[in-house]
Amino acid sequence: MNVILAHDSEDKSPVIFETTPTYANLFGTIQRAYDARGGWTSDFMDLRAGSLLRADGGFLIMYSLEALSEVGVWRALKRTLNHNRLEIQPLEMFYPFGGSAQKPEAIDINVKVILIGDRSLYELLYEYEEDFRKIFKVRVEFDEEMAMSD
């Protein structure tokens, strides 16, 4: 058995700030090693949790433009948040000649994602991306400068 992540039931809700929302960093991955026969291998001990799983039961915070700029991230993020199920997959694009990889079962997750971005990007996504409206129902605005209070 490989426990890729354990949350104590008495722990507070995790808050994860993902500064580099690559596919592997967000969704996790299955690492592979080059073996003596010249192929790529992996087993259940090679599963690595991503930010979404580490934030399970809590909050994941990231910059919206960073997430939108990474290949495959936006589509997978929408799918994951729409179904509340996370699939950890190997990054096949980096291992085009890899052997058979592990295919773990999808994991039920409960995570709230907070995207940080400017108003124009929000309005663009809200107008043209139907799933964005369903997933991100609340918009919060802060001033760039705020007075310090006691």
Predicted regions and their residues:
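Conserved ASCE/P-loop NTPase catalytic core
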Residues: 1-127, 131-149
